[in-house]
């Protein structure tokens, strides 16, 4: 039995999110949460929150035992970019792209 949690539109680049996701893929959830708690990266706290949501979903909806859960799949996809304007010399402007991403976490036994 597998349970999912999804967080969309996170203000984090997909590349930086994948660095954190690769560290916890396939691990037991207690070990994964421990790794995320002590990681200094911004994405670690965001992914930890999504993982806690997936664990709570598994416990509440499916009655799963937390001690046997593992991170089945975790992946980060690119979302829409926020387009911003930065003023430049001689009346010109430059476009600034602020990337977002979607985080998908699946836990199961």
UniProtKB/Swiss-Prot annotation:
This protein's name: Large ribosomal subunit protein uL22
Record NCBIfam families: rplV_bact
Lineage per the UniProt record: Bacteria, Pseudomonadati, Pseudomonadota, Betaproteobacteria, Rhodocyclales
Subunit structure: Part of the 50S ribosomal subunit.
GO molecular function, one term: rRNA binding
Annotated GO CC locations: cytosolic large ribosomal subunit
InterPro entries: Ribosomal_uL22, Ribosomal_uL22_bac/chlpt-type, Ribosomal_uL22_bac/org-type, Ribosomal_uL22_CS, Ribosomal_uL22_sf
Pfam families recorded: Ribosomal_L22
PROSITE patterns: RIBOSOMAL_L22 (PS00464)
Keywords: Ribonucleoprotein, Ribosomal protein, RNA-binding, rRNA-binding
Record's signal peptide: none
Function: This protein binds specifically to 23S rRNA; its binding is stimulated by other ribosomal proteins, e.g. L4, L17, and L20. It is important during the early stages of 50S assembly. It makes multiple contacts with different domains of the 23S rRNA in the assembled 50S subunit and ribosome. The globular domain of the protein is located near the polypeptide exit tunnel on the outside of the subunit, while an extended beta-hairpin is found that lines the wall of the exit tunnel in the center of the 70S ribosome.
The organism of origin for this protein: Aromatoleum aromaticum (strain DSM 19018 / LMG 30748 / EbN1)
Family: Belongs to the universal ribosomal protein uL22 family.
Domain of life, per lineage: Bacteria
Gene Ontology process terms (BP): translation
């Amino acid at each position: 039995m597998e349970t999912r949690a999804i967080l969309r539109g996170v203000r984090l680049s997909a590349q930086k999110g994948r660095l954190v996701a690769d560290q916890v893929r396939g691990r037991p959830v207690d070990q994964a949460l421990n790794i995320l708690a002590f990681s200094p990266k911004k994405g670690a706290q965001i992914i930890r929150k999504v993982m806690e949501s997936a664990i709570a979903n598994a416990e509440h909806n499916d009655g799963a035992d937390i001690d046997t859960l593992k991170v089945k799949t975790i992946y980060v996809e690119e979302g829409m970019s926020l387009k911003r304007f930065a003023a430049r010399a001689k009346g010109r402007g430059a476009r600034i792209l602020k990337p977002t991403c979607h985080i998908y976490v699946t836990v199961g036994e």
